[in-house]
Regions:
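Extracellular polysaccharide-degrading/modifying enzymes targeting complex plant/algal/animal polysaccharides
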Residues: 1-174
């Protein structure tokens, strides 16, 4: 469905009080491996993902697409917006650094430790949705034959408001 203007962005969608799942592609395991746990924090590798052939591409709305990954360690998950994808070299860069290197999990075999969210290719089950903010389009696969009239995206007008005035003049660092 066409949204009110381009550029409208949100990362969650609701049907009444029920949170709807964002479109999720099939999971994969990164093709790179951390050479040593002591190197897992090395800053130069926190934005780089080496991925299997066919799992990522340079989507037209790449800034809407997120990588969800267990980076090197199994006890946490990062949601990272993609910055660039080179499908030929199979290297992606994220706009935000991961907590650890974006490599496969050390010392444990997983069938999938990463997946992509918010692409049309991932929209494969009823109740899922994907957003293309560049085109101002929301794609939703309803759970029933027709979509509910209670579909909403949360919005925030302001995060913090400070009002009033100080009784004393401020000097120095504040």
């Amino acid at each position: 469905s066409k949204l009110m203007g381009q550029g409208l962005r949100f990362r969650s969608l609701y049907d009444g009080e029920e949170r709807l799942d964002r479109a999720r592609a099939k999971g994969f395991v990164p093709t790179s491996e951390c050479p040593s746990p002591s190197l897992a924090h090395r800053w130069e590798y926190l934005h780089t993902l080496h991925f299997p052939e066919g799992t990522l591409k340079n989507w037209e709305n790449l800034d809407d697409v997120e990588l969800v990954i267990r980076p090197t360690q199994q006890w946490l998950i990062n949601y990272l917006p993609l910055k660039s994808v080179d499908a030929e070299k199979r290297i992606a860069k994220t706009a935000v650094a991961g907590t650890y290197r974006l490599d496969r999990v050390v010392r444990k075999k997983w069938e999938e430790t990463a997946w992509i969210e918010n692409t049309l290719e991932g929209l494969d089950e009823p109740g899922e949705w994907a957003l293309n903010s560049r085109k101002g389009l929301l794609y939703y696969w309803p759970k029933q034959e027709r979509p509910s009239k209670n579909i909403t995206a949360p919005g925030l007008r302001e995060l913090i408001r400070i009002e009033g005035k100080n009784n004393e003049a401020l000097t120095g660092d504040v």
